[in-house]
Design a protein with these regions (language model features):
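Ubiquitin-like/PB1-type beta-grasp interaction modules and other compact soluble beta-rich domains
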Residues: 1-186
Length: 186
């Protein structure tokens, strides 16, 4: 990231014979003031593995200087009527563990093919379920909320990953540690 004020970027290009060229660029950066709008992202909440599709269809959300990604997500979910439960804080170590909204889980219908996969993978069904919330350890031992930014799964909490103008963030529910949504890392 660039610091406020003058920044120097030095680049050395080398070919396979060892010849090189050095370039130096001075970049002046004027940082936005804390709380100033710096862009817009698109946020959605996907519960396809439960047969529910989008719990929150893609919507535009303003982002502000000094605000963590977790803060922007909480603001978007709460403005859509969700109650959020999480560990850590919006500033550090944030993990979204559960979202609540009246009737959110009433029409759960886990696809049969996914049930077969979970059974063959050896995951334990917990039997936990709440018609008014969806969260960690509901249905299976490997369930919970993960997220993608611009289609790529990210490591770490939402408080620790940067976002920028134009990014797309999708919260995705998994029943199998991400294996069922393409986000599993061994």
């Amino acid at each position: 990231y660039l610091s406020n004020g003058s920044n120097t970027l030095d680049i050395r290009l080398t070919d396979k014979e060892g010849r090189y060229a050095d370039y130096s660029f001075n970049i002046n950066c004027i940082k936005a003031a804390d709380g100033e709008k710096i862009g817009t992202i698109t946020i959605s909440v996907d519960a396809n593995v439960l047969g529910l599709n989008y719990l929150l269809s893609p919507q535009k959300v303003d982002i502000y200087q000094g605000e963590t990604t977790a803060r922007a997500v909480l603001r978007a979910l709460e403005s859509a009527g969700f109650v959020c439960h999480y560990t850590g804080t919006a500033e550090q170590g944030f993990y979204l563990s559960r979202i609540e909204k009246q009737g959110i889980g009433e029409n759960v219908a886990i696809p049969g093919e996914l049930v077969d996969y979970i059974n063959s993978d050896g995951l334990t069904w917990t039997g936990a379920r709440d018609n008014n919330s969806i969260g960690e350890n509901d249905y299976t031992q490997g369930s919970g909320w993960m997220y993608t930014i611009n289609g790529s799964f990210q490591g770490g909490g939402l408080s620790d990953v940067p976002i920028k103008d134009g990014d797309t963030l999708c919260l995705r529910y998994t029943l199998a540690y991400g294996k069922d949504i393409g986000g599993y890392v061994s």
